[in-house]
Design a protein with these regions (language model features):
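Short, intrinsically disordered terminal tails adjacent to the first/last structured region
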Residues: 1-25
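Terminal, non-globular segments
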Residues: 25-492
């Protein structure tokens, strides 16, 4: 009898321990669910409060095209560097939900939440549940993640596709399967169709697989996935090359600026540093206990595209903007969690919680002022219906390149966000943004006959004054000036 009581007690104790273990195992998932819900609420706040920015208006303009063929022509002809997959997906999404600010931005919220879920899933696969939770907490409330979620642009979609591709590649490496390899290849092709930086990610993944090959690991299906991704993108390569040329030319007039003209020695040094870092990633001695080397993989996946942009900017031409690395920013949370966790799991958890709390405190102060398109439309509507609205044709340029002739945006870059909010009959007139004399003469002629007008300009100071009509005959008042982008509105 006593033996039976002892056995019963031991069985009961084992059951209690099992239940406690199950609850402990579920705790990271339960906490992540709470983080996910909180992130969804934060991402969804103020979606329709701010006017669309100029780039967001281009997303709406492309999505409103009648079909896929017209959408494909939009980035090719008018908006170099923007890839078509985001516009196509947004087109069908807005056919269901409409073209309002909330509808346009809500798709970014969906992809941002998908990115957050993929950060957690990758952490569980590559590291452990607690590291995954720490990484998800660091990314969920990061101001960058919130900005991406609040913007109707391709970056949340790009991040979600890239992280989904990384997850499938990881699984194909560790648990090879034909279906998984095909899915990995399709996702890999979707990356450059969303943003050309996806090609650099594919290159980084090829370096990872090359390391596996050098160490005697074949990864046949993983190589097939990369080959499938490249094969599916090949038909678009001529268009991508044309777009890249237009993108680089257009953006050196704008925020990228002209070549840095570093000395040859600096260019050689940059190339050698990049080559050395790549060789270390591919051939360096293993320092991780896990044969899959998750930390090295993350370093390569994040670091090699970043290095390519930096070295390309030094050797060739400025080509780097931090938002091009949106997938790497999300993956960096995993790398940070893994690195700190290797030192101390306690400090990793504390720092992750502290960082998330700090981000939540910062969020109310991180909002920038919206662009003035809504206000501009209201002011023009309050004026005369015959007053022309002038837009500068050409790429948006900086002060040093304002007079460089170019064929970008022949209808005027800022006409698209203006037309999103304004449906009046006022004539829209494109003037050459790189030819101030011709622009001024056109403005004087049309304003004289109409009795008034509006100039929407990206210029400031002397460059703007050179376009304005003769102050002895015309009065010009600056009505609006945006903070984030060089948008000025002058009432003539």
């Amino acid at each position: 009898m006593a033996d039976k009581e002892i056995l019963a007690a031991e069985a009961g104790s084992a059951t209690i321990e099992s239940l406690a273990g199950d609850r402990s195992a579920r705790r990271p998932l339960e906490i992540f669910a709470a983080v996910f819900v909180a992130a969804g609420l934060i991402y969804s706040v103020h979606l329709g409060a701010d006017a669309l920015g100029a780039s967001e208006a281009y997303s709406a303009w492309a999505a409103a095209k009648p079909g896929v063929c017209a959408i494909v022509r939009t980035p090719v002809l008018h908006d170099p560097g923007k890839q078509l997959l985001y516009y196509v997906v947004l087109h069908y999404y807005t056919r269901i939900f409409g073209l309002s600010e909330i509808s346009l931005r809500s798709m970014s919220v969906i992809f941002s939440l998908t990115t957050l879920a993929l950060v957690f899933a990758l952490g569980c696969e590559m590291l452990d549940e607690h590291a995954a939770l720490a990484a998800a907490a660091m990314w969920a409330f990061n101001p960058l993640a919130v900005v991406f979620a609040h913007t109707a642009r391709m970056y949340p979609m790009f991040s979600a596709i890239a992280l989904a591709h990384l997850l499938t590649l990881w699984r194909v490496r560790s648990r090879p399967g034909v279906i998984g390899a095909i899915g990995c290849g399709i996702l890999g092709a979707a990356m450059p169709y969303t943003h050309l930086a996806g090609l650099l990610i594919l290159g980084a993944e090829a370096a990872i697989l090359l390391r596996d090959f050098v160490r005697g690991r074949r990864d046949t299906l993983a190589w097939m996935a990369i080959a499938l991704a490249i094969g599916l993108f090949i038909p678009y390569i001529p268009v991508a090359i044309q777009q890249s040329q237009g993108l680089i030319y257009g953006h050196w007039l704008d925020y990228l600026g002209p070549p840095y003209n570093y000395p040859l020695a600096a260019k050689i040094a940059a190339a050698l540093v990049a080559a050395g870092f790549t060789l270390w990633l591919v051939l360096g001695r293993a320092v991780e206990r896990d044969a899959d080397e998750p930390t090295r993989l993350l370093v390569a996946w994040i670091g090699l595209p970043t290095l390519a942009f930096i070295v390309g900017s030094v050797i060739l031409h400025p080509m780097f903007n931090p938002r091009y690395l949106a997938p790497g920013m999300a993956a960096a949370a995993l790398l940070i969690a893994a690195s700190i966790g290797a030192w101390s799991t306690k400090w990793r958890n504390l720092l992750a919680a502290g960082f998330a709390l700090a981000c939540l405190i910062m969020l109310p102060f991180a909002r920038s002022r919206p662009e003035p398109w809504r206000d501009l439309a209201a002011q023009v509507a309050a004026g005369g219906p015959s007053d022309p609205v002038f837009f500068e044709a050409g790429f948006v340029s900086n002060e040093d390149t304002a007079n460089v002739a170019n064929g970008g945006f022949p209808f005027g870059y800022y006409s698209v966000p203006f037309d999103y909010y304004f449906a009046g009959a006022n004539p829209r007139i494109a003037i050459p943004g790189f030819d101030s004399e011709t622009a001024r003469m056109t403005i004087e002629e049309r304003v004289s006959s109409a009795g008034g007008g509006w100039l929407v300009s990206w210029k400031e100071g002397g460059a703007l004054n050179a376009e304005l009509p003769d102050p002895k005959r015309f009065k010009a008042d600056e009505k609006l000036r945006a903070e984030r982008h060089p948008v000025g509105v002058v009432d003539l």
